[in-house]
Amino acid sequence: MGNSHRGFESHALRMGRLVYSVIGSLDGYVDDAEGGFAWAMPDEEVHAYVNDLMRPIGTHLYGRRLYAVMAGWQTLGTSPDESAVTRDFGELWRGADKVVYSTTLDEVSTPRTRLERSFDPDAVRALVAASDRDVLLGGPGLAEHALRAGLVDEIGVVVAPVVVGGGTAYLPDGLRLDLRLLEERRFANGFAALRYAVVG
């Protein structure tokens, strides 16, 4: 693998696509059997790469649990004592719209956020088509709905150098997709990034 800035530049020029991007283990999980994901925490180099992937994103799609985690970025990354990479991510997150899918939440706690009761593939397709920026899927649950509906244009995985043996899989069982490699990159801490276009 090698660094591919050209891969990111071509990504940044393609707008209005639905992207699914995760940090996961080599054996395909976003968390382990106990729900832990400390092993997936990026260092500064990986975090900077994730920030670059965020720059074309105009809207985030979340389920309830991931939204509860990510909502912390409304205040995280706002202190001058935090690293430049952390502040950059916070600014990118706060600058994007969010859609939260939940049947149990009564309200959302962050600006630029709306609540939807169900994931409607036709509505998501229309959202992406009307957007001049990319839309990012957050979490395997929403991703399964979108993948099975044929909505996803790109899948990105930052692979952590760990095998966890079980947990929440980032791809659903029984799904077959043909992919085209867009970018591969490796990092000093042993993480590796892969981005694929969904072609069929």
Where are these regions (language model features)?
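Enzymes that bind and transform nitrogen-containing heteroaromatic metabolites
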Residues: 11-200
